[in-house]
Amino acid sequence: MAITVDGQERRIALALSGGGFRAAAFHLGVMRKLQSLGLLSRVDLLSCVSGGSIAGAFVALNWQRATVLDELENYLATRSIAVSSVIGGILDPFESRLDKLAKTYDRDLFKGASLSALRSGPRLYLNATNLSTGNMFFFVAGGAGPEEMGEHELGVVGAANFSLARAVAASSAFPPVFPPLRIDAPEYEPAAQVDYVTLADGGVYDNMGVNPTLRPRNAIDYLIVSDGGKPFANDAQPTESGGMVLKAALDIMMEQIRGLEFDRMQHRHQAGVGPKPMWFSIDSTNGQAQDGDAQFASSIKTNLTSLNAAQRAVLVRHGGALVESRIRVYAPELLA
């Protein structure tokens, strides 16, 4: 899958952020544009979070299918899964909301696939947050590598038979809408060190999914970061309501993490130890296809509700325009 640049093979990674169906449609636009530029098939590694995991896992599972992007768009246009999963979990005392979510993903997207079904596609990281240790917890498969799950503190184990739908559900278990995924020692042996692990939305730790792409063993040369998450809203007159103040404080912390991740990408590349980064966010106006696309795209809610035709059109157009503009400015050699 690597691309040849100046006579040498180079590896491309694509990071797909969290942000619900809005982010998934934004990423769809990015992947459509990469496909039209002849670069999607050259992607060696996908690192995904939450809404990005929904899109990335489905595309990776069906990597060879010509209609995969059309099928993803149809899914985003016709499914609203959050409400049904929440209500179903409340009414059913024997099955949690997260179990309902995983079953919904499996029915509509993954059809019983396990991580081992990803072997023909790029290396895929589905990122969650381990609330037991505070670390990023990943599920990884594809790219002719082993299927694994784990984290740096507790350890990594084989996971060929782990359900793809459960991995995506863990990555998108946004609190408090969905409870975390609990994994016990029989399924993840290192969990015995802490009784069990509880996995929540990967965006709690790293909403852009950048961490796996910077690991030396993945040897990435170019990093495209598609950030469809919620941009920080500057409010000249913030409310004094306790709940809103807490929300603003959390948003500021997330914005700081986002900025630090971007700085880390830049510094590593400038030091010669990291890939060339091409990062853009849903509120980026520099490179938008049409005036107002960034504002409209940013105003769409970050939930798991179906998107209408106008929303999908803008998100897809905006994502495609931004990724092409970044490549043409920062890595034109990829288009040579």
Question: Over which residues does each language-model region extend?
Answer:
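N-terminal regions that are enriched for targeting/export leaders
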Residues: M1-D6, I12
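Patatin-like phospholipase
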Residues: E9-A15, G20-T104, V140-A141, G145-E148
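Structural recognition of the beta-strand scaffold that forms the well-ordered cores
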Residues: A13, L45-C48, Y125-N127, L199, ...
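Flexible loop/turn segments at secondary-structure boundaries
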Residues: F21-A24, S53-G56, T133-N135, D206-M208, ...
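Active-site gating loop/helix substructures
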Residues: R22, T78, S84, G88, ...
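Non-catalytic peripheral regions of patatin-like phospholipases
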Residues: Q64-L101, G142, A191-A336
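Extended, Lys/Arg-enriched charged tracts that mediate electrostatic binding to polyanionic substrates
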Residues: L101-P122
